[in-house]
Design a protein with these regions (language model features):
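Positively charged, solvent-exposed patches that mediate nucleic-acid binding
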Residues: 1-132
C-alpha cells in the first residue's frame, strides 16, 4: 500500500505540553544545518505514528518571509520522505514526536536540506533502534 504524499493537520505537532516534553527530555541529533528533537510517547487518538513541527530562529532570520521559506522547504522534504519514516515506525501503541529545527546561519536550498534531512534520519534511527 502506497502512502499519499500529503501532510494532514493530525500530523502536525501543536500541543504545548508535547513540545515542552521534547525540550525537557533533550534527546536530539543534528546534521548541520538541521537539528531534530524527538520523544517517544503513547499514541493517542491519532492514526499517524509521527507528529512533527518545524522551527526557524527569529534571531538568525529576521524576516518572516525567509523563516517561512525554510519551514516550507523542511515540510516538503518531510512530506516526500515520510513513507520511509512510517515504514520503520510501525508500532501500534507508540508515537514519535519530532521538532525539526533549522540552525544554519545562512539560507539553504532544497537539495541541501533534503540531503541533510536524510542523513539526520539515519542518525535518528540509529539512536531509536537500541531503545525499541
Amino acid at each position: 500500500m502506497s502512502l499519499p504524499n500529503t501532510f494532514s493537520k493530525e500530523e502536525r505537532l501543536k500541543s504545548r505540553k508535547q513540545i515542552g516534553l521534547l525540550f525537557k527530555n533533550r534527546q536530539s541529533v543534528g546534521s548541520y544545518p538541521l537539528r531534530i528533537f524527538w520523544a517517544e510517547t503513547e499514541r493517542e487518538a491519532s492514526k499517524y505514528p509521527v507528529a512533527i513541527s518545524f522551527s526557524v530562529s527569529k534571531r538568525i532570520f529576521k524576516q518572516a518571509v525567509k523563516r517561512n521559506r525554510h519551514k516550507r522547504l523542511m515540510l516538503e522534504v518531510f512530506r516526500l520522505h515520510k513513507h520511509e519514516l512510517y515504514e520503520k515506525l510501525n508500532s501500534e501503541t507508540k508515537q514519535l514526536n519530532l521538532m525539526l529545527i533549522y540552525v544554519g546561519k545562512e539560507p539553504a536550498d532544497f537539495a541541501t536540506i533534503e540531503k541533510k534531512y536524510l542523513k539526520l534520519m539515519d542518525k535518528l534511527f540509529a539512536q531509536i533502534a537500541p531503545q525499541t
